[in-house]
Every structure is written in structure tokens, then in C-alpha cells.
């Protein structure tokens, strides 16, 4: 049986007998290649996609946009950033709306990792484009990121 094509590489296609998913246990998909640390299980239906997304503490996305509108529901932790120029501080239990093509950035606060549920229409996949046109990597708060992790490992030796 041929696998149904998805707009997001690595996503699972719902339907044809597939109606429930253990999203927290699914293969992790990069949900912001080149501009974000977001990753998690992604399921696509006929017109919507759903993601169970993880952002490690002190990390997140640089300013970016995508052609599809999006809702993010914060399950654990706190996201901070901006949507269309408006500041956002979203602790667990908060729903964030991101209009199509709206520049936005969301970063996990340094105190704990964030888990959020992402819902997007399928006019586009889960990955957008950085506003500055580069794919140089995600945003890291001071003291976080690959360099900080390697310095911490070296200090323990």
C-alpha cells in the first residue's frame, strides 16, 4: 500500500483507517527548519494539520511568517515573543492566534521547556520562512544554545 503524501516531510497522514495518534510518542519532525528549535509529532488531515510541539527552554524561533494561519495552545511552560508587532506572554492554558503571513517570533522562557499544540490550515505545510530570508538557525536566549551547552560540558570535566 502506498503512503499518502503530506505537505510536511515526516508527518503522518490521517484517514484511510488512521483515526487516533499517540502524538507525544511519534517521530519528531522539525517544525521550523533554519529558524526555530520547534519539533514534534505532526498529523495532517485533508485540510488541517496538528502538531504536538516541543521547544527546549531558552530557545525558539527567529522572526518568521507562513502562508497559513495558525493557533498555538500552550500545554506546559511559557512562550514569549510577538505576533504582528504585538507582544505576547503566554503561560500554560493560553491560546495564541497567528494570522496568515503575520511576522512572529515565539521563544520558550528560560525556566522550563514548552509543549504546545499547533493547528494550521493546509494551504501550506508546518514550516515557514524567516523574515530576513536566511536559514541561519534558531533564536537562543543568552546562556542557551549549542555554544552554551558545550561550555557547560567542558566546565564539568
Q: PLM ranges: what are they?
A:
Residues 86-100:
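Short acidic-glycine-tyrosine-enriched beta hairpin
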Residues 100-126:
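Ligand-binding loop in jelly-roll beta-barrel domains
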Residues 40-42, 61-66, 107-109:
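Short histidine-centered beta-strand/loop micro-motifs
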Residues 60-62, 77-82:
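Short beta-strand segments in beta-sandwich/barrel cores
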Residues 68-79:
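Glycine- and acidic-residue-biased ligand/ion/polar-headgroup-sensing regions
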Residues 34-36, 51-65:
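Conserved short histidine dyad/triad with adjacent acidic residue
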Residues 1-47, 129-157:
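A short, N-terminal "cap"/entry segment at the start of jelly-roll beta-barrel domains
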Amino acid at each position: 500500500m502506498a503512503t499518502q503524501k503530506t505537505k510536511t516531510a515526516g508527518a503522518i497522514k490521517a484517514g484511510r483507517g488512521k483515526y487516533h495518534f499517540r502524538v507525544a510518542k511519534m517521530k519528531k519532525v522539525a517544525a521550523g527548519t533554519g529558524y526555530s528549535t520547534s519539533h514534534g509529532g505532526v498529523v495532517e488531515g485533508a485540510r488541517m494539520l496538528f502538531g504536538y510541539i516541543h521547544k527546549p527552554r531558552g530557545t525558539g524561533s527567529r522572526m518568521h511568517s507562513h502562508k497559513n494561519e495558525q493557533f498555538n495552545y500552550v500545554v506546559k511552560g511559557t512562550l514569549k515573543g510577538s505576533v504582528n508587532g504585538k507582544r505576547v506572554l503566554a503561560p500554560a492554558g493560553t491560546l495564541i492566534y497567528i494570522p496568515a503571513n503575520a511576522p512572529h517570533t515565539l521563544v520558550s522562557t528560560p525556566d522550563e521547556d514548552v509543549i504546545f499544540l499547533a493547528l494550521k490550515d493546509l494551504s501550506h505545510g508546518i514550516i515557514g520562512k524567516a523574515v530576513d530570508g536566511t536559514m541561519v538557525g534558531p533564536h537562543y536566549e543568552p546562556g542557551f544554545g549549542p555554544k552554551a551547552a558545550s561550555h557547560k560540558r567542558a566546565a564539568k570535566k
